[in-house]
Amino acid sequence: MLKSAKGTWITDWNPEDPKRWDPALAWRTLWITTFNLTLSFITWYVVSALVVRLPKVGFELSTTQLFWLTAMPGLAGGTLRIIWTFLPPILGTRHLVTFSTLLLLIPLLGWGFAVQNTGTPYWVLLLLAFLAGIGGGHFSGYMPSTSYFFPKRLQGTALGLQAGIGNFGVSIVQFVTPWIIGFALFGSLLGGPQTFTPKPGVSQPIWLQNATFAWVPFVLLGALLAWVYLRSVPIRANFREQFDIFRDKHTWIMTSLYIMTFGSFSGFSAIFPLLIREVYGKFEGAPDPLRYAFLGPLVGSLARVIAGPISDRLGGAIVTQVSAIGIFLSALLVTLYTRPTSLDQFPMFVVAMLLIFFFSGVGNASTFKQMPMIFPPRQAGGVIGWTAAVAAYGPFLFSTLAAYTQQATGGFTAFFYGLMVFYAFNFFLNWYYYARKGAEKPC
């Protein structure tokens, strides 16, 4: 067994050779990187937890402006994933994870101060929302970086754990936020409370800055752990070879399928709180969006973990077929409750939305199983990085389309009908190329 180097770069590393592999270092790398990836997802989605409170503390923002705030982290996340895909061989794991984690301090501190002043210009809020997308970019750097440390027989397990646990960051931030903003976590050290007015004549103090300041100590801890305990594997980077994936039609087919699955997960995670607010907020005794919003990403993340082994046994294509059918029917069910006449319809609206999250989580796992089966090893990593980057635009696409639909039609039913067309198209693509008998690339 290889003894880990004390400096940054490891020499003579080969996970396929037990004498040149250090499993303790590999698993340590996985857990530290996963901890930091979870913080990245928390930062990426903290805006979705904040926006539903902003109008009630004095920010004068329209529905369209609120949706654009949830859109910007997705715009940044997708773009930055393309950049982060190329960083692991350049920076190495130690520097990549350490410095990427420290970058999270910019949006966390920025939002912590911005929410305390209702006069903060809208363009500043948009910029801070965009910067929160830094957390979304990390995924495409951390995943390949971690893969360098494991033999192929363990890469599926290791990366499945990292992706699955990292996704829980979305539900963590949406679950913790309504609790943590309810008391003076830092006393008066980092600012006083805001006046929250859930309905006319009723007000209470809240500390919105806690939603971001609370994660700063964890970010500093994550960066310290990465710098002290992580090492880097020298990897030859040949970027020109990777570009041939764009000449393969299956790259584009899998991109579409992953937009259906992870794009739906990430997109609905961003807008679920606002959907609850806009669709059911008009009723007396309207539900608090943040009491329910975290359930969606929680269900989706659990489904991804569960569906991984099932995809290994049954094959990714057949599980993706089930995912596509499930998302389509769930979206159809949602449309029955997007123009409610009473709060009695709210429970079924939540159930239908959770079904979308469940089946999108299933598809997240199965599509990751398909790609290594469709592409040779040299291309598979690039395809996974590319599809993950494009699907990370989910929050941007879903937020802007939902805002446009609401503005044009006064509701969200047409938004879900449009998604159903896209889901049906992807059902056909997956069936024709991968799932049917005699398919071009059975997987």
UniProtKB/Swiss-Prot annotation:
GO CC, one annotated term: plasma membrane
PANTHER family: HIGH-AFFINITY NITRATE TRANSPORTER 2.3
GO molecular function: antiporter activity; nitrate transmembrane transporter activity; nitrite transmembrane transporter activity
Recorded catalytic activity of this chain's protein: nitrate(in) + nitrite(out) = nitrate(out) + nitrite(in)
Cystine bridges: none
Protein name, per record: Probable nitrate/nitrite antiporter NarK2
Subcellular location, record wording: Cell membrane
Membrane topology according to the record: Multi-pass membrane protein
Protein family membership: Belongs to the major facilitator superfamily. Nitrate/nitrite porter (TC 2.A.1.8) family.
SUPFAM superfamilies referenced in this protein's UniProt entry, alphabetically: MFS general substrate transporter
Task performed by this protein: Probable nitrate/nitrite antiporter that may be involved in nitrate import and nitrite export during anaerobic growth.
InterPro entries noted in UniProt: MFS, MFS_trans_sf, NO3_transporter, NO3_transporter_NarK/NarU-like
NCBIfam families in alphabetical order: 2A0108
